[in-house]
C-alpha cells in the first residue's frame, strides 16, 4: 500500500438553506460553457427534479452536462442533500450511529457477481451493523436487490420494518424506489439515457439511514475523489474504492485505488491485496449471471466455498470493517485490515454468515 497524498415532507425541506432564484437556461448555459455552478444552483435543479417540476428533457440535459463539465464535491453534495430531504425518513431512534453501507455506483460494465451484497451479509455476521442501500440492475444482469430477492429476502420493506430488521438481525436493506419515490422521474430518464451521468454518484450518497461509515465503490476514477469530498464534509468514515481494472469494488485482479475519508480529511492510497496474501484472480472468475445464478454463488460462498469469489467477498467485507473501525480516532490502518480480514473469514467459516442470511430471510417474510 502506498500513500500518495418520498420525501420526508415539504416542511422538512423548507427548513433547509434558501435556494437562489435560477432557471434552466441560466443553469444549463453555465454547464455547457464548462463553468461550475454558483452555490445553491445544483440544489435548485435537484429541487425542480424531485418536486416534479422539471421536464424530462431538462433532467437529461442537466445530468449529461453536469457529467461532461465534471461536478464538484459541493455540487454533488447539494444534489444528495436535496434528494435526502425528499426521502422517506428512517426512525432515527432505532438506527445505531455506527451503521455501515457497502454499495457502489454501478456503471463499470463488467457484470460481476454481487460482491457488495455478499460482503454486506458477511460484515453483519461479523458483528458490524449494516444498512445497505441498493436497487435493481440498471445495465447488468442482476443488481443487489435482484439477488437478495432471489435469496428470499423481501426487498420492499418500509422504514420501520428495515429498522426492526437492523435491530433484530444486524442488517437491513433500503430498496431505493421504496425510499426515494420522488426520484422516479429522474430514474426513468437515467435509464433512457443509457450512459453514466452525475446521477450514478447519488445512490451511495443518499442512503436514507445516513450511515456514518461505509465501503463505497466508484466505477469512475475521475469522480471518486469528488464522492470522497462529499463524505468528508459529513464527517463520515468511508473508503471510496476503485479497482484499477475498472470495478466499483476492491478488486483481486490487480491493485485498487482507495480514497480514505476520516475526520474530515481525504487520503489517496494504492492498495495491493497481494500484501495480505491474496492470489491474483482473473476478471473472468468474478463474472456473474442472472439473479438466480448470482444467488446460487452467494449461497456457495456464504456456505464456505473457497475460490476467487470468496477472496473478493472477504476483501470487500474487510474494507467495510476497516471503515467502521475508522469511526474511532484510535484506529490504525494495518491492524484494522488484519482484524477485518480475520473477522470476515471467521464469519463465513463459522457458519455465522449463512445463518444470518437464513434469519434475515425468515424475518423479512414474516415482518
Curated annotation (Swiss-Prot):
This is Anthranilate phosphoribosyltransferase. One of its GO terms (molecular function) is magnesium ion binding. HAMAP family: TrpD (MF_00211). Keywords: Amino-acid biosynthesis, Aromatic amino acid biosynthesis, Glycosyltransferase, Magnesium, Metal-binding, Transferase, Tryptophan biosynthesis. The gene is trpD. 5-phospho-alpha-D-ribose 1-diphosphate binds at residues 104, 107-108, 112, 114-117, 132-140, 144. Binds 2 magnesium ions per monomer. The lineage of its organism: Bacteria, Bacillati, Actinomycetota, Actinomycetes, Mycobacteriales. It holds the Pfam family Glycos_trans_3N.
Amino acid at each position: 500500500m502506498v500513500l500518495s497524498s418520498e420525501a420526508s415532507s415539504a416542511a422538512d425541506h423548507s427548513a433547509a438553506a434558501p435556494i437562489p432564484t435560477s432557471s434552466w437556461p441560466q443553469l444549463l448555459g453555465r454547464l455547457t460553457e464548462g463553468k461550475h455552478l454558483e452555490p445553491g444552483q445544483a440544489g435548485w435543479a435537484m429541487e425542480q427534479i424531485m418536486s416534479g417540476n422539471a421536464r424530462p428533457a431538462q433532467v437529461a440535459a442537466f445530468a449529461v452536462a453536469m457529467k461532461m463539465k465534471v461536478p464538484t464535491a459541493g455540487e454533488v453534495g447539494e444534489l444528495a442533500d436535496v434528494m435526502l430531504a425528499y426521502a422517506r425518513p428512517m426512525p432515527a431512534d432505532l438506527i445505531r450511529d455506527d451503521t455501515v453501507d457497502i454499495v457502489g455506483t454501478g456503471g463499470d460494465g463488467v457484470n460481476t457477481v454481487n460482491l457488495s451484497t455478499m460482503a454486506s451479509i458477511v460484515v453483519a455476521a461479523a458483528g458490524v451493523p449494516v444498512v445497505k442501500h441498493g436497487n435493481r440492475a440498471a445495465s447488468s444482469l442482476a443488481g443487489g436487490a435482484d439477488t437478495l430477492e432471489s435469496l428470499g429476502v423481501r426487498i420492499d420493506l418500509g422504514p420501520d420494518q428495515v429498522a426492526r430488521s437492523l435491530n433484530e438481525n444486524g442488517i437491513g436493506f433500503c430498496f431505493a424506489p421504496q425510499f426515494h419515490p420522488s426520484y422516479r422521474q429522474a430514474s426513468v430518464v437515467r435509464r433512457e439515457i443509457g450512459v453514466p451521468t452525475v446521477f450514478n454518484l447519488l445512490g451511495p450518497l443518499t442512503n436514507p439511514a445516513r450511515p456514518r461509515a461505509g465501503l463505497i465503490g466508484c466505477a469512475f476514477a475521475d469522480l471518486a475523489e469528488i464522492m470522497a469530498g462529499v463524505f468528508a464534509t459529513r464527517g463520515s468514515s468511508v473508503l471510496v474504492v476503485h479497482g484499477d481494472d475498472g470495478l466499483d469494488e476492491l478488486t483481486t485482479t490487480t491493485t485498487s485505488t482507495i480514497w480514505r475519508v476520516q475526520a474530515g480529511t481525504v487520503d489517496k492510497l494504492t492498495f495491493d491485496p497481494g500484501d495480505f496474501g491474496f492470489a491474483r484472480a482473473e476478471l473472468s472468475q468474478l463474472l456473474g449471471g442472472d439473479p438466480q445464478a448470482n444467488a446460487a454463488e452467494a449461497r456457495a460462498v456464504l456456505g464456505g466455498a473457497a475460490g476467487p469469489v470468496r477472496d473478493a467477498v472477504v476483501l470487500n467485507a474487510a474494507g467495510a470493517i476497516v471503515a467502521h473501525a475508522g469511526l474511532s480516532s484510535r484506529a490504525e490502518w494495518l491492524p484494522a485490515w488484519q482484524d477485518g480480514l480475520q473477522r470476515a473469514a471467521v464469519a463465513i467459516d463459522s457458519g455465522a454468515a449463512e445463518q444470518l442470511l437464513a434469519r434475515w430471510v425468515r424475518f423479512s417474510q414474516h415482518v
